Amino acid sequence: RDNADSVRWLREACDLIGAHLVHVSTDYVFDGMLDRAYREDDPTNPLSVYGASKLAGELAAGPDATLVRTSWVCGAHGGNMVKTVLKFMHERPTLSFVADQRGCPTFTADLAPLLRRLGTGGFTGVYHATNRGAVSWYEFVRDIVAAAGGDPEMVLPITTADLQPPRPAPRPAN
């Protein structure tokens, strides 16, 4: 509900001042059952309350907004998977990550200019914005560890069913 209400309030504020709304959403609006990358016009089917609330936010943004769906966001500022892995690789002998969920990492240094371009260029509608190439969390973490000079063999593959504790919001597998 918060994801819908906050977007509705932003849309109303934008309407009052004549600003264009760019709303960032997520791949959680899909169920992950396709074996290919999702397209903007694919039907949504969220698996979790979070995904449903993000979809409600997309609807609350209205038809004149720019909706940008992204995934696996990481960058120099704020918390993200890359920073978590870099911390854990020095604290733990092994790291276990799921090999049965795939997605596209998205770097903020690439996403931010695109959001600006979409927001100022008169674009409306739904856009998917990620970096190229899909990987599993397991593959992504192995690459992070290797790039940081660590041993990628310290990263062990597990399945989503093996996660302990289970994730609070079911994540689409693709």
What are these regions (language model features)?
Residues 2, 41, 48, 103-106, ...:
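Residue-level signal for the nucleotide or nucleotide-sugar donor/cofactor binding architecture
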Residues 16-17, 64, 148:
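Helix C-cap/helix->beta junction micro-motif
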Residues 109-117:
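Amphipathic alpha-helical segments that line or abut small-molecule/effector binding pockets
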Residues 114, 121-167:
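Mid/C-terminal beta-alpha module of Rossmann-like enzyme folds, strongest
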